[in-house]
Design a protein with these regions (language model features):
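Outer-membrane beta-barrel architecture
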Residues: 59-61, 99-101, 174-176, 215-217, ...
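Transmembrane beta-strands of outer-membrane beta-barrel pores
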Residues: 30-38, 66, 76-82, 115-117, ...
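Sec/Tat signal peptide C-region and signal peptidase I cleavage site
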Residues: 14-19
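Outer-membrane beta-barrel "beta-signal"
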Residues: 104, 214, 346-358
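Detector for outer-membrane/organellar transmembrane beta-barrel domains
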Residues: 209-317
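Transmembrane beta-barrel outer-membrane domains
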Residues: 21, 47-55, 89-93, 164-168, ...
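Outer membrane beta-barrel
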Residues: 21-34, 49-194, 208, 218-220
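Repeated loop/turn-to-beta-strand initiation elements of outer-membrane beta-barrel proteins
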Residues: 68-72, 106-110, 181-185, 222-229, ...
Length: 358
Protein backbone atom coordinates (compact mmCIF):
# COMPACT_ATOMS: atom_id res chain seq x y z
CA UNK A 1 0.00 0.00 0.00
CA UNK A 2 2.86 2.41 0.79
CA UNK A 3 4.43 1.69 -2.60
CA UNK A 4 1.15 2.26 -4.47
CA UNK A 5 0.58 5.55 -2.62
CA UNK A 6 4.11 6.66 -3.48
CA UNK A 7 3.54 5.80 -7.13
CA UNK A 8 0.26 7.72 -7.32
CA UNK A 9 1.89 10.72 -5.67
CA UNK A 10 4.66 10.78 -8.29
CA UNK A 11 2.21 10.59 -11.16
CA UNK A 12 0.03 13.37 -9.74
CA UNK A 13 2.82 15.72 -8.69
CA UNK A 14 5.03 15.53 -11.77
CA UNK A 15 2.51 15.58 -14.60
CA UNK A 16 -0.86 16.70 -13.34
CA UNK A 17 -1.83 18.47 -16.54
CA UNK A 18 -0.37 16.32 -19.31
CA UNK A 19 -1.62 12.92 -20.42
CA UNK A 20 1.11 10.34 -20.89
CA UNK A 21 1.17 6.82 -22.28
CA UNK A 22 0.86 3.55 -20.42
CA UNK A 23 2.74 0.38 -21.34
CA UNK A 24 3.04 -3.07 -19.81
CA UNK A 25 5.69 -5.75 -20.02
CA UNK A 26 5.53 -9.25 -18.58
CA UNK A 27 7.10 -12.69 -18.69
CA UNK A 28 6.20 -16.05 -17.20
CA UNK A 29 8.43 -19.11 -16.93
CA UNK A 30 7.93 -22.62 -15.59
CA UNK A 31 10.94 -24.76 -14.68
CA UNK A 32 10.87 -28.51 -14.04
CA UNK A 33 13.96 -30.27 -12.71
CA UNK A 34 14.94 -33.80 -11.77
CA UNK A 35 18.19 -34.49 -9.96
CA UNK A 36 19.94 -37.69 -8.97
CA UNK A 37 22.48 -37.33 -6.15
CA UNK A 38 25.23 -39.72 -5.17
CA UNK A 39 26.75 -39.06 -1.73
CA UNK A 40 30.23 -40.27 -0.85
CA UNK A 41 30.70 -43.01 1.73
CA UNK A 42 32.27 -40.46 4.11
CA UNK A 43 29.00 -38.51 4.34
CA UNK A 44 27.70 -39.18 7.88
CA UNK A 45 23.95 -39.34 7.16
CA UNK A 46 21.76 -40.78 4.46
CA UNK A 47 20.02 -38.12 2.36
CA UNK A 48 17.60 -38.27 -0.53
CA UNK A 49 19.10 -39.33 -3.85
CA UNK A 50 16.12 -38.48 -6.08
CA UNK A 51 14.74 -34.94 -6.02
CA UNK A 52 12.07 -33.22 -8.11
CA UNK A 53 11.65 -29.46 -8.23
CA UNK A 54 9.25 -27.21 -10.14
CA UNK A 55 9.19 -23.43 -10.01
CA UNK A 56 6.91 -20.77 -11.46
CA UNK A 57 8.34 -17.29 -12.00
CA UNK A 58 6.36 -14.24 -13.11
CA UNK A 59 7.58 -10.72 -13.94
CA UNK A 60 5.38 -7.69 -14.61
CA UNK A 61 6.19 -4.04 -15.23
CA UNK A 62 3.46 -1.42 -15.56
CA UNK A 63 4.87 1.92 -16.72
CA UNK A 64 3.52 5.42 -17.18
CA UNK A 65 5.57 7.49 -19.66
CA UNK A 66 5.11 11.01 -18.37
CA UNK A 67 7.21 12.48 -21.17
CA UNK A 68 10.49 11.75 -22.94
CA UNK A 69 12.57 12.23 -19.77
CA UNK A 70 10.33 10.87 -17.02
CA UNK A 71 8.81 7.46 -16.42
CA UNK A 72 7.15 5.89 -13.37
CA UNK A 73 6.71 2.12 -13.03
CA UNK A 74 5.45 -0.61 -10.74
CA UNK A 75 7.57 -3.78 -10.96
CA UNK A 76 6.97 -7.20 -9.46
CA UNK A 77 8.73 -10.58 -9.45
CA UNK A 78 6.84 -13.54 -8.03
CA UNK A 79 8.24 -17.05 -7.45
CA UNK A 80 6.38 -20.16 -6.32
CA UNK A 81 8.40 -23.31 -5.73
CA UNK A 82 7.25 -26.86 -5.03
CA UNK A 83 10.36 -28.51 -3.61
CA UNK A 84 12.99 -26.08 -2.35
CA UNK A 85 13.99 -28.44 0.41
CA UNK A 86 16.67 -31.07 0.92
CA UNK A 87 16.61 -32.35 4.49
CA UNK A 88 17.60 -29.25 6.47
CA UNK A 89 17.58 -26.46 3.88
CA UNK A 90 14.55 -24.60 2.65
CA UNK A 91 14.95 -21.31 0.79
CA UNK A 92 11.21 -20.76 0.87
CA UNK A 93 8.27 -21.92 -1.20
CA UNK A 94 7.25 -18.35 -1.98
CA UNK A 95 9.29 -15.29 -2.86
CA UNK A 96 8.57 -11.84 -4.18
CA UNK A 97 9.98 -8.48 -5.12
CA UNK A 98 7.62 -5.53 -5.44
CA UNK A 99 8.79 -1.96 -5.88
CA UNK A 100 8.07 1.40 -7.51
CA UNK A 101 10.60 2.90 -9.91
CA UNK A 102 10.97 6.48 -11.07
CA UNK A 103 13.29 7.34 -13.99
CA UNK A 104 14.46 10.89 -14.58
CA UNK A 105 17.47 12.78 -16.00
CA UNK A 106 18.94 12.85 -12.48
CA UNK A 107 18.89 9.06 -12.11
CA UNK A 108 16.68 6.12 -11.17
CA UNK A 109 14.93 5.88 -7.79
CA UNK A 110 13.24 2.74 -6.46
CA UNK A 111 11.39 2.08 -3.22
CA UNK A 112 10.07 -1.27 -2.02
CA UNK A 113 11.18 -4.89 -1.89
CA UNK A 114 14.25 -5.00 -4.11
CA UNK A 115 17.89 -6.08 -3.95
CA UNK A 116 20.54 -3.51 -3.05
CA UNK A 117 22.53 -1.62 -5.69
CA UNK A 118 25.77 -3.55 -5.12
CA UNK A 119 23.91 -6.83 -5.71
CA UNK A 120 22.21 -5.47 -8.83
CA UNK A 121 25.52 -4.17 -10.23
CA UNK A 122 27.51 -7.34 -9.50
CA UNK A 123 29.31 -9.30 -12.20
CA UNK A 124 31.30 -12.52 -11.84
CA UNK A 125 31.28 -16.13 -12.96
CA UNK A 126 28.72 -16.55 -15.79
CA UNK A 127 25.69 -18.83 -15.47
CA UNK A 128 25.43 -21.27 -18.37
CA UNK A 129 22.16 -22.80 -17.18
CA UNK A 130 19.39 -22.51 -14.59
CA UNK A 131 21.55 -23.75 -11.68
CA UNK A 132 23.45 -20.64 -10.59
CA UNK A 133 26.84 -20.71 -8.86
CA UNK A 134 25.87 -17.90 -6.41
CA UNK A 135 23.04 -18.57 -3.94
CA UNK A 136 22.85 -21.82 -5.83
CA UNK A 137 19.76 -23.94 -6.48
CA UNK A 138 22.12 -26.91 -6.12
CA UNK A 139 20.97 -27.00 -2.48
CA UNK A 140 17.69 -28.43 -3.79
CA UNK A 141 19.64 -31.55 -4.77
CA UNK A 142 22.69 -31.79 -2.46
CA UNK A 143 22.28 -30.95 1.23
CA UNK A 144 24.59 -28.35 2.76
CA UNK A 145 24.99 -28.30 6.58
CA UNK A 146 26.45 -24.77 6.50
CA UNK A 147 23.26 -23.19 5.14
CA UNK A 148 19.98 -23.55 7.01
CA UNK A 149 16.70 -21.76 6.43
CA UNK A 150 13.23 -22.85 7.40
CA UNK A 151 10.43 -20.38 8.01
CA UNK A 152 11.78 -17.49 10.09
CA UNK A 153 14.74 -19.59 11.28
CA UNK A 154 18.04 -19.36 9.46
CA UNK A 155 21.72 -20.04 9.98
CA UNK A 156 24.56 -19.28 7.58
CA UNK A 157 27.92 -20.54 8.79
CA UNK A 158 29.53 -19.46 5.52
CA UNK A 159 28.62 -17.03 2.74
CA UNK A 160 26.41 -18.44 -0.01
CA UNK A 161 27.29 -15.79 -2.60
CA UNK A 162 30.05 -13.46 -3.77
CA UNK A 163 27.47 -10.69 -4.15
CA UNK A 164 26.34 -8.57 -1.19
CA UNK A 165 23.01 -10.24 -0.37
CA UNK A 166 22.84 -10.07 3.45
CA UNK A 167 19.62 -8.01 3.30
CA UNK A 168 18.08 -10.00 0.41
CA UNK A 169 14.93 -8.45 -1.06
CA UNK A 170 14.03 -6.50 2.07
CA UNK A 171 12.27 -3.11 1.92
CA UNK A 172 14.72 -0.38 0.87
CA UNK A 173 15.33 2.83 -1.02
CA UNK A 174 17.71 2.63 -4.01
CA UNK A 175 19.22 5.39 -6.11
CA UNK A 176 21.34 4.92 -9.25
CA UNK A 177 23.03 7.81 -11.06
CA UNK A 178 22.87 8.37 -14.82
CA UNK A 179 25.66 6.66 -16.75
CA UNK A 180 28.73 8.88 -17.17
CA UNK A 181 31.65 7.49 -19.18
CA UNK A 182 29.93 4.06 -18.99
CA UNK A 183 29.97 4.26 -15.19
CA UNK A 184 27.10 4.20 -12.70
CA UNK A 185 27.10 4.79 -8.95
CA UNK A 186 24.40 3.58 -6.59
CA UNK A 187 23.24 3.89 -3.00
CA UNK A 188 20.82 1.80 -0.91
CA UNK A 189 19.26 2.56 2.46
CA UNK A 190 17.78 -0.46 4.25
CA UNK A 191 15.79 0.33 7.44
CA UNK A 192 15.39 -3.36 8.39
CA UNK A 193 17.78 -6.03 7.11
CA UNK A 194 15.68 -9.13 7.77
CA UNK A 195 14.35 -10.81 4.61
CA UNK A 196 13.33 -14.33 3.64
CA UNK A 197 15.81 -14.05 0.76
CA UNK A 198 18.70 -12.78 2.92
CA UNK A 199 21.12 -14.12 5.51
CA UNK A 200 19.88 -12.39 8.69
CA UNK A 201 17.92 -14.55 11.11
CA UNK A 202 14.89 -13.06 12.82
CA UNK A 203 16.30 -14.46 16.07
CA UNK A 204 19.43 -12.29 15.82
CA UNK A 205 19.96 -9.17 17.93
CA UNK A 206 20.53 -7.06 14.81
CA UNK A 207 17.74 -8.32 12.51
CA UNK A 208 15.84 -5.01 12.57
CA UNK A 209 18.89 -2.72 12.37
CA UNK A 210 19.53 -0.46 9.39
CA UNK A 211 22.16 -0.75 6.67
CA UNK A 212 23.81 1.34 3.95
CA UNK A 213 25.11 -0.13 0.68
CA UNK A 214 27.12 1.56 -2.08
CA UNK A 215 27.83 0.19 -5.55
CA UNK A 216 29.80 1.04 -8.69
CA UNK A 217 29.43 -0.46 -12.16
CA UNK A 218 31.53 0.18 -15.28
CA UNK A 219 31.86 -1.33 -18.71
CA UNK A 220 34.24 -0.56 -21.54
CA UNK A 221 35.64 -2.02 -24.76
CA UNK A 222 39.27 -2.99 -25.28
CA UNK A 223 39.75 -3.92 -28.93
CA UNK A 224 37.43 -6.94 -29.41
CA UNK A 225 36.80 -7.44 -25.68
CA UNK A 226 33.77 -6.26 -23.70
CA UNK A 227 34.74 -5.78 -20.06
CA UNK A 228 32.43 -5.24 -17.08
CA UNK A 229 33.55 -4.43 -13.54
CA UNK A 230 31.71 -3.92 -10.25
CA UNK A 231 32.55 -2.78 -6.72
CA UNK A 232 30.37 -2.89 -3.63
CA UNK A 233 30.46 -1.83 0.01
CA UNK A 234 27.88 -2.58 2.69
CA UNK A 235 27.67 -1.41 6.29
CA UNK A 236 25.15 -3.49 8.25
CA UNK A 237 24.78 -1.90 11.66
CA UNK A 238 25.81 -4.23 14.52
CA UNK A 239 26.23 -7.04 11.99
CA UNK A 240 29.02 -6.74 9.42
CA UNK A 241 30.97 -4.65 6.94
CA UNK A 242 31.15 -6.15 3.45
CA UNK A 243 33.35 -5.51 0.41
CA UNK A 244 32.80 -7.01 -3.05
CA UNK A 245 34.44 -6.81 -6.46
CA UNK A 246 33.90 -8.56 -9.77
CA UNK A 247 34.93 -8.65 -13.41
CA UNK A 248 33.56 -10.19 -16.59
CA UNK A 249 35.26 -10.36 -20.01
CA UNK A 250 33.35 -11.25 -23.19
CA UNK A 251 34.65 -11.98 -26.70
CA UNK A 252 32.99 -13.80 -29.60
CA UNK A 253 30.71 -16.01 -27.51
CA UNK A 254 33.22 -16.60 -24.71
CA UNK A 255 32.64 -15.15 -21.23
CA UNK A 256 35.21 -15.30 -18.43
CA UNK A 257 34.21 -13.95 -15.03
CA UNK A 258 35.24 -13.88 -11.38
CA UNK A 259 34.11 -12.15 -8.19
CA UNK A 260 35.06 -11.89 -4.51
CA UNK A 261 33.30 -10.95 -1.25
CA UNK A 262 34.83 -10.26 2.18
CA UNK A 263 32.88 -9.75 5.40
CA UNK A 264 34.08 -8.39 8.77
CA UNK A 265 31.89 -8.77 11.85
CA UNK A 266 30.73 -5.87 14.01
CA UNK A 267 30.50 -7.44 17.46
CA UNK A 268 29.65 -4.55 19.80
CA UNK A 269 26.00 -5.61 20.02
CA UNK A 270 26.16 -9.30 19.02
CA UNK A 271 29.19 -11.56 19.31
CA UNK A 272 30.04 -13.79 16.38
CA UNK A 273 28.75 -17.35 16.75
CA UNK A 274 28.97 -20.44 14.57
CA UNK A 275 25.33 -19.96 13.53
CA UNK A 276 26.07 -16.59 11.87
CA UNK A 277 29.74 -17.13 11.04
CA UNK A 278 29.19 -15.70 7.54
CA UNK A 279 29.70 -12.30 9.23
CA UNK A 280 33.46 -12.97 9.32
CA UNK A 281 34.45 -14.78 6.13
CA UNK A 282 35.12 -14.63 2.42
CA UNK A 283 33.91 -16.17 -0.84
CA UNK A 284 35.06 -16.19 -4.45
CA UNK A 285 33.97 -17.67 -7.76
CA UNK A 286 35.45 -18.20 -11.21
CA UNK A 287 33.73 -19.33 -14.39
CA UNK A 288 34.02 -19.70 -18.16
CA UNK A 289 31.14 -20.14 -20.63
CA UNK A 290 30.70 -20.36 -24.39
CA UNK A 291 27.56 -19.58 -26.38
CA UNK A 292 27.04 -20.67 -29.96
CA UNK A 293 23.58 -20.42 -31.47
CA UNK A 294 21.00 -22.04 -29.16
CA UNK A 295 23.66 -23.86 -27.08
CA UNK A 296 25.42 -22.46 -24.01
CA UNK A 297 27.95 -24.46 -22.03
CA UNK A 298 30.12 -23.49 -19.08
CA UNK A 299 32.07 -24.48 -16.01
CA UNK A 300 32.10 -22.59 -12.71
CA UNK A 301 33.79 -22.84 -9.32
CA UNK A 302 32.65 -21.41 -5.96
CA UNK A 303 34.45 -21.39 -2.61
CA UNK A 304 33.38 -19.84 0.69
CA UNK A 305 34.96 -20.10 4.13
CA UNK A 306 34.44 -18.82 7.65
CA UNK A 307 37.53 -16.95 8.90
CA UNK A 308 36.89 -17.84 12.57
CA UNK A 309 35.68 -21.43 12.21
CA UNK A 310 36.65 -24.40 10.05
CA UNK A 311 33.41 -24.37 8.01
CA UNK A 312 33.91 -24.26 4.25
CA UNK A 313 32.06 -24.91 0.98
CA UNK A 314 33.41 -25.88 -2.42
CA UNK A 315 31.22 -26.25 -5.52
CA UNK A 316 32.15 -27.18 -9.09
CA UNK A 317 29.45 -27.22 -11.77
CA UNK A 318 29.41 -28.04 -15.48
CA UNK A 319 26.25 -26.64 -17.09
CA UNK A 320 24.68 -26.92 -20.52
CA UNK A 321 21.50 -25.34 -21.85
CA UNK A 322 19.88 -25.68 -25.27
CA UNK A 323 17.15 -23.30 -26.44
CA UNK A 324 14.96 -25.59 -28.52
CA UNK A 325 12.68 -22.74 -29.53
CA UNK A 326 11.57 -19.36 -28.16
CA UNK A 327 9.37 -21.11 -25.58
CA UNK A 328 11.37 -24.19 -24.57
CA UNK A 329 14.84 -24.69 -23.06
CA UNK A 330 16.54 -27.97 -22.11
CA UNK A 331 19.41 -28.17 -19.62
CA UNK A 332 21.89 -30.61 -18.11
CA UNK A 333 24.01 -29.81 -15.05
CA UNK A 334 26.73 -31.95 -13.47
CA UNK A 335 27.87 -30.70 -10.08
CA UNK A 336 30.02 -31.62 -7.11
CA UNK A 337 29.82 -30.11 -3.62
CA UNK A 338 32.04 -30.47 -0.57
CA UNK A 339 30.62 -28.91 2.59
CA UNK A 340 32.80 -28.99 5.69
CA UNK A 341 31.07 -28.61 9.06
CA UNK A 342 32.04 -30.74 12.05
CA UNK A 343 31.99 -33.49 9.42
CA UNK A 344 32.27 -33.37 5.64
CA UNK A 345 29.24 -33.75 3.38
CA UNK A 346 30.28 -34.61 -0.17
CA UNK A 347 27.84 -35.19 -3.01
CA UNK A 348 27.59 -35.40 -6.80
CA UNK A 349 24.43 -34.42 -8.68
CA UNK A 350 23.13 -34.88 -12.22
CA UNK A 351 20.27 -32.47 -12.91
CA UNK A 352 17.97 -32.48 -15.94
CA UNK A 353 15.85 -29.41 -16.65
CA UNK A 354 12.91 -28.53 -18.88
CA UNK A 355 11.81 -24.88 -18.91
CA UNK A 356 8.91 -23.12 -20.62
CA UNK A 357 8.70 -19.36 -21.11
CA UNK A 358 6.10 -16.90 -22.37
Amino acid sequence: MKICSFMLFLLFFINKANAGSIEMDYSISLGNFYGYTDYSSSTPLKYKTNNLNSSLNAYTKLSYNINYDYKASLISYIMIDTAKEVENYNQGYWGEEFFAEFESPTGVFTVGQDYNVAYNFSVGAPNAGPIKINNTELTNFITNPNWYKKGSKSSYKTLNSTYINTDGASFKLNYVTPSVLNTKLGFSYIPNTNSSAGLVSKDSLYYNDEAYVFGLYNYFYLKDYEIETSLGYGNYKNNSEEYSLGMSIYRKGWTLGASYLKTSAQTKKALLTLQDAYREGHAYNLGLSYEIGPLTTGIAYFNSKSDKFSNQNEIISFSNSYKYNKYTTLSLTLAKQNAKDDKTTKGYATILGLEFAL
